[in-house]
């Protein structure tokens, strides 16, 4: 079966929508491409995040450029030997994990917000297998290159701020800092 090409230039309302499916569309490259465009901040909540996924390197590069990078990881997944926790903390990326006793058993989100202007959601864990061998998906909502349509910018910002508020809520209500 021939892989389908990604859907390009599709809007819902005023927000650009770009669905991608792994392994055919290499969603990891889309994450990296969008993080390279970031100007101020990257916020994320991820269930599984492995070292050398490519996404961790892009976050480290963003932090080295002076961007704020903040994330929430699942407690059990973050403690695995293959997890990106140490790489990210070494780069001074602010990390949290779900606390025990809060009623939150797992952080199962796969959610990223870039510059409060773009939201990336889906089933895609931040791992090599998710990109190469799993059937996974992401939906990119927004366009970081959009600068000439105030109504569309407001719509994507509203959506991104709503998603970041969920990340912030989880950190405040159920999170604890990862210090090492």
Label every model-predicted segment.
Residues 27, 32-41:
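Secondary-structure "cap/kink" motif recognition
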Residues 1, 9-11, 41, 53-180:
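PLD/PLD-like phosphodiesterase catalytic module centered on the HKD motif
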Residues 1-30:
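Short, compositionally biased "basic patch" segments
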Residues 48-49:
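Long, repeat-rich segments with strong aromatic
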């Amino acid at each position: 079966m021939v892989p389908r090409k990604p859907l390009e230039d599709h809007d819902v309302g005023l927000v650009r929508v770009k669905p991608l499916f792994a392994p055919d569309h290499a969603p990891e490259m889309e994450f990296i491409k969008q993080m390279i465009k970031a100007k101020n901040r990257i916020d994320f909540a991820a269930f599984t995040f492995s070292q050398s996924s490519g996404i961790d390197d892009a976050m480290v590069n963003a932090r080295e450029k002076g961007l704020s990078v903040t994330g929430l990881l699942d407690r059990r997944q973050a403690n695995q030997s293959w997890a990106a926790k140490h790489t990210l903390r070494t780069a001074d990326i602010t990390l949290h994990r779900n606390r025990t006793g809060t009623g939150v058993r797992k952080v199962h989100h796969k959610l990223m917000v870039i510059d409060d202007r773009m939201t990336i959601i889906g089933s895609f864990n931040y791992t090599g297998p998710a990109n190469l061998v799993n059937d996974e998906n992401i939906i990119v909502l927004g366009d970081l290159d959009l600068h000439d349509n105030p109504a569309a910018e407001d719509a994507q910002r509203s959506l991104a701020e709503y998603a970041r508020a969920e990340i912030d809520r989880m950190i405040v209500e159920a999170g604890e800092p990862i210090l090492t």
